[in-house]
A protein has these predicted regions:
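Class I SAM-dependent methyltransferase Rossmann-like catalytic core
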Residues: 1-17
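A short glycine-rich, Lys/Arg-flanked "PGG" loop and its adjoining helix->strand segment in the class I
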Residues: 113-128
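Class I SAM-dependent methyltransferase SAM/SAH-binding core
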Residues: 36, 42-89
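A short SAM/SAH-binding and catalytic strip from SAM-dependent methyltransferases
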Residues: 99-111
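C-terminal helical/coil "lid" or tail adjacent to the Rossmann-like core of SAM-dependent
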Residues: 2-7, 188-244
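Conserved catalytic/acceptor-binding region of the Class I
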Residues: 130-199
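A short acidic, Gly/Pro-enriched loop at the edge of an enzyme's catalytic core
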Residues: 90-99
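Conserved alpha-helix/loop element of class I SAM-dependent methyltransferases that forms part
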Residues: 14-33, 48
């Protein structure tokens, strides 16, 4: 990727353990399996899996440092963390992984098909690859200005941030197409909704709203006064108990490439 992302996961991950349990459930790893998480972030999903070895790969040294702290009490010496750019060949041997996960990575990569082929290369013959992604165009906020909220969400979905090599914020709804185009066997398709009813620091809706503001500020796409006014409106809704936020995550469970 173009560079190390800001510490976005630190703001979002702690309040969505259900997302990581969902992903771990899709992996369905057995105690003797080898599991790789491509774009592991701070290790929250790997901490949920049973495996003889977990491998986390991420471009961010800061995320990997946090992942080491998260995984040490769970997996001890059975975890391996590697800093690598996922647009390059993966530092994993052919047919060496029983389970491979890629969550919220594809939108950032310039060649998704090449990456998926690389991920499939690492799978053992009976292995399982999970392609999972948030569809950022499904971000829902109750708002005092519906049209403005729609505009901000769409703009955020389409904004390439400095640490991204590409942007496709709606990739979540296209995962089946990606998998089948790459010759994978699609075994299952699932979705989950993450919900938050408070607009407070540490809550998911608060985190995503401030991510939106930060991204659009950095891109110079929206006036600061407009963004500040939008956040103020969300705070007022929270004070009245009328705030609600949700987003959709999609996942495709895949077997190895068709011959």
């Amino acid at each position: 990727m173009a560079g190390e992302p800001d510490d976005v996961d630190a703001m979002i991950e702690p309040v969505v353990p259900s997302r990581h349990r969902w992903l771990a459930g899709l992996l369905a790893a057995a105690p003797g399996d080898r599991v790789a998480d491509l774009g592991c972030g701070t290790g929250s999903t790997l901490a949920q899996v049973a495996a003889s070895l977990v491998v986390g790969i991420d471009v961010s040294s800061a995320a990997l440092a946090r992942a080491a702290d998260v995984l040490a009490p769970v997996h001890g010496t059975r975890s391996l963390l590697v800093q690598a750019d996922l647009k390059d060949p993966l530092p994993i041997a052919d047919a060496s992984a029983d389970r491979v996960l890629c969550h919220d990575v594809l939108e950032c990569l310039p060649d998704t098909d090449a990456f998926v082929a690389e991920a499939a290369r690492t799978l053992r013959p009976d292995g399982r690859l999970i392609l999972a992604h948030t569809d950022y165009d499904t971000l829902v906020f109750t708002s005092e200005d519906l049209q403005l909220t729609r505009q901000l969400v769409h703009a955020y979905c389409d904004t390439q941030q400095p640490w991204m090599d590409a942007v496709d914020g709606t990739i979540g709804r296209h995962l089946v197409e990606v998998a089948e185009r790459c010759g994978l066997v699609v075994e299952d398709v699932q979705a989950t909704v993450v919900l938050s009813r408070r607009f407070q620091p540490g809550e998911l809706g608060w985190g995503y709203a401030h991510n939106i503001v930060g991204a659009l500020q950095g891109a110079g796409r929206t006036e600061q006064a407009v963004l500040d006014g939008w956040l103020d409106g969300l705070r007022r809704l929270d004070e009245r108990g009328a705030f609600l936020f949700s987003l959709n995550d999609y996942a495709v469970v895949c077997g190895r490439m068709r011959r």
